[in-house]
Swiss-Prot record:
GO terms for biological process: L-ascorbic acid biosynthetic process. It comes from Arabidopsis thaliana. Belongs to the oxygen-dependent FAD-linked oxidoreductase family. Its cofactor is FAD. GO terms for cellular component: membrane. Pathway: Cofactor biosynthesis; L-ascorbate biosynthesis. The gene is GULLO1. InterPro entries: ALO_C, FAD-bd_PCMH, FAD-bd_PCMH-like_sf, FAD-bd_PCMH_sub1, FAD-bd_PCMH_sub2, FAD-linked_Oxidoreductases_BP, GULLO2-like_C, GULO_Plant. One of its GO terms (molecular function) is D-arabinono-1,4-lactone oxidase activity. Residues 1-18 form the signal peptide. This is Probable L-gulonolactone oxidase 1.
Length: 595
């Protein structure tokens, strides 16, 4: 206990800067013969994505020239952002002959209009830059994800969001008034077409481009409709989760920026009471989220080794004890929020929107030889995880929460793996006019949990409980998966859940009739060809399939395909203890002559 708390304190003494993340694109010869990955160093299927070359345009004119050349040559094209935080294979081209277009240097402000409260930026601008540029004009982006390392193009491509039911909701794309898109063209167009999209010019094209998965072309520029600067008043409160099902339905109507951190094995919820207040309200608060700060690589390696030890030994007691220490520590330091940028003196914490909405100081760039880094940097022994994220309709949230509670009642230690990553983050979203945006008011559940870095066939402690939650959400509660997160199975048949999918596909056909910006992966998730699931030995362990056979799990290690415990239609990899040569399931069938 003393060692663990000392280690946490050691990590708490974080640094002002860290080694910046590596470029996700690596090439053997100049900008040719390349591979691309994401910021975590692995896709859900652990495949290596290759491309013939990568291009780094610095202006829209250069971007237009690159798209024209690729179209003329009939090459597949995908867009790569500065850090590539999407977990699925959204950046991969098919085969080895495609072209990657990086927006790394498309990172400039194009124009401002303080009177109209608009800001136009290139698509490679990061959320951090966007927030800062808006603040210079005394304007604010009202909602955004909590991690500021995403780019404008990445935000738009995957439908990234914050947390709110108020106004237009929490999705960044719903605060966009205009998009410039560069797409393939006909020979008569010079093989390229630049479109200016807005609600007034062509609503269907604009609504398709708001969340496009990169299949319509390259976003060149985006114009944001901002709001006058305001402040926020934030208080975190931890309570037991006895009435959480009821609270979850109504809490978002009471607080504009409400969210939750649910610790189901501990029976606790952290409520975020977060409201807009006038800009002249006293307070200089700053939210520098602790897990997004630079961390000592040696400390991260020790923490990861402890986690690996818990998994290999099957020791849920240690996992639960450490999870409680981590969550208690983070709550005790208010997750990194301070009243004056230096210290936390008490709630409420009041600060300007640009200081309270997003953070990510581990991106601050000074090369230090990886002495410090972002916790998930694949070059070190640090965090490596699955991330399952989905939106449950608000009208059905109480039932979903109660189902999870029922699982915890069966085995209280089963979800400590989620709490070791600070619990289930739950954010409010609302319906969006974007064709691939959210369909209705909902709560977005974000589950982060251990993944073996070296062995895709390694089962996880109590993995059947998390798999059951995943399948329960997707199949029983008709949840919408987050486009930029998730394992393959979450996208099985997903396009059928969007009422405007056919209209989106018509726009796609108009923008890119040859499918140069489409890939095998995008065709699968859009329901055009094939299926995202991959059926093979051990496929269910990493969410590549839903098991239908013991071989899809890890039978040699005692993990067999079994029905869910609460959602019995689920098929999950369960650790089965054998007695007298038969597991419990087989003994049951023998008793009733079922085999």
């Amino acid at each position: 206990m003393a060692f663990w708390l000392s280690l946490i304190f050691f990590c708490f003494c974080t640094f002002a800067s860290s080694t910046p993340p590596d470029d996700p694109v690596k090439c053997e010869s100049g900008n040719n013969m390349c591979t691309v990955t994401n910021s975590y160093g692995a896709f859900p299927d652990r495949s290596i994505c290759e491309a013939a070359k990568v291009e780094y345009p610095k202006t829209e004119a250069e971007l237009v020239s690159i798209v024209a050349a690729a179209t003329r040559a009939g090459q597949k094209v995908r867009v790569v952002t500065r850090y590539v935080h999407s977990i699925p294979k959204l950046v991969c081209t098919d085969g080895k002959d495609g072209v990657l277009i990086s927006t790394k240097f498309l990172n400039n402000v194009v124009g401002t209009n303080p009177e109209a409260k608009t800001l136009t930026v290139e698509s490679g601008v990061t959320l951090r830059q966007l927030i800062g540029e808006a603040a210079e004009l005394e304007l604010a982006l009202p909602h955004a994800p909590y991690w500021w390392g995403l780019t404008v193009g990445g935000l738009m491509g995957t439908g990234a969001h914050g947390s709110s039911l108020w106004g237009k909701g929490s999705a960044v794309h719903d605060y966009v008034s205009e998009i410039r898109m560069v797409s393939p063209g006909l020979a008569s167009d010079g093989y390229v077409k630049v479109r200016v999209l807005s609600e007034t010019i062509d609503p269907d094209e604009f609504r398709a481009a708001k969340v496009s998965l990169g299949v319509l072309g390259v976003i060149s520029q985006v114009t944001f409709q901002l709001q006058p600067m305001f402040k926020r008043s934030l208080t975190f409160v931890m309570q037991n989760d006895s009435d959480f099902g009821d609270q979850a339905v109504t809490f978002g109507e009471k607080h504009e920026f409400a969210d939750f951190l649910w610790l189901p094995s501990q029976g606790k919820v952290v409520y975020r009471m977060d409201d807009r207040v006038p800009v002249n309200t006293s307070g200089n608060g700053l939210f520098d989220f602790f897990p997004f700060r630079p961390q000592l690589s040696v400390a991260l390696a020790i923490i990861r080794s402890l986690e690996e030890s818990e998994e290999s030994s099957g020791d849920a007691n240690d996992k639960c004890a450490r999870a409680e220490q981590i969550t208690s520590f983070l709550f005790s330091i208010s997750y990194g929020v301070t009243n004056n940028g230096m210290e936390f003196t008490g709630y409420p914490v009041i600060g300007k929107q640009n200081h309270m909405m997003s953070s990510g100081t581990c991106l601050d760039s000074h090369q230090d030889g990886l002495i410090t880094s972002c916790p998930w940097d694949p070059r070190i022994k640090g965090q490596f995880f699955h991330q399952t994220a989905f939106s449950i309709p608000l009208t059905r949230v109480k039932g979903f929460i109660n189902d999870i509670k029922a699982l915890v009642k069966i085995e209280p230690k089963s979800l400590c793996a989620l709490e070791r990553s600070n619990g289930i983050l739950i954010r409010y979203v609302t319906s969006s006019p974007a064709f691939l945006g959210k369909e209705e008011k909902a709560l977005d559940f974000d589950l982060t949990y251990y993944r073996s870095k070296d062995d895709p066939l390694a089962p996880r402690l109590y993995e059947d409980f998390i798999e059951e939650i995943e399948q329960m959400a997707i199949f029983k509660y008709n949840a919408l998966p987050h486009w930029g997160k998730n394992r393959n199975l979450a996208f099985d048949g997903v396009i059928r859940k969007y009422k405007n999918a056919n209209t989106f596909l018509k726009v796609k056909e108009r923008f890119d009739p040859l499918g140069l910006f489409s890939t095998e992966w995008t065709n699968q998730i859009l329901g055009l060809k094939g299926n995202v699931t991959i059926v093979k030995e051990g496929c269910a362990l990493e969410g590549l399939c839903v098991c239908s056979d013991d071989a899809h799990c890890a039978p040699k290690k005692g993990y067999l395909c079994r029905p869910g415990k609460v959602y019995t239609k689920a098929r999950v990899c369960t650790h089965v203890k054998s007695v007298n040569g038969y597991d419990d399931h087989t003994k049951f069938n023998l008793m009733f002559n079922r085999i």
